[in-house]
C-alpha cells in the first residue's frame, strides 16, 4: 500500500509564466541576450573548427576524406548556431516590446 501512495514529483513543477504572477521583463531580455551571445560564440567556434579541418585536409592528403567530413559537420554546426543566435535575437526584440508595453500600461 505504501508503494502505491508514493509519488515522485518529477512533472509537478510549475513554470513561473504559467502561474500568472508578474513577469520580470528585464530578466527575460537579459536571458535572451545571453543566449544570443552563446549562439554567436558557438557559430564562431564551429566556423573556426571548419577552417581548421579544411587546412588539415590540404596538409594531410592521406586522411583528407576524414577531414572533409569533419569540416562539413562543423560548417553545419556553425549554421545551426547562427540560426539559434538569430532566433534568440528575435526573442529578445519581442521581450523588449513586451517590456515596453508593460511599462506603458503601468505609467498612465
From Swiss-Prot:
Residues 1-34, 84-108 are annotated as: Disordered. Residues 25-34 have a biased composition (Basic residues). InterPro entries: ABA_WDS. Transmembrane segments: none annotated. It comes from the Eukaryota. Residues 15-24, 95-108 have a biased composition (Basic and acidic residues). Belongs to the abscisic acid and water stress-induced protein family. This is Abscisic stress-ripening protein 3. The gene is ASR3.
Amino acid at each position: 500500500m505504501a508503494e502505491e501512495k508514493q509519488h515522485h514529483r518529477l512533472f509537478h513543477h510549475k513554470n513561473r509564466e504559467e502561474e500568472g504572477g508578474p513577469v520580470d521583463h528585464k530578466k527575460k531580455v537579459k536571458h535572451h541576450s545571453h543566449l544570443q551571445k552563446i549562439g554567436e560564440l558557438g557559430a564562431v567556434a564551429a566556423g573556426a573548427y571548419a577552417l581548421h579541418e579544411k587546412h588539415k585536409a590540404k596538409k594531410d592528403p592521406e586522411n583528407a576524406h576524414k577531414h572533409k567530413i569533419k569540416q562539413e559537420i562543423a560548417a553545419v554546426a556553425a549554421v545551426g548556431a547562427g540560426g539559434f543566435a538569430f532566433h534568440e535575437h528575435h526573442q529578445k526584440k519581442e521581450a523588449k516590446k513586451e517590456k515596453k508595453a508593460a511599462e506603458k500600461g503601468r505609467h498612465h
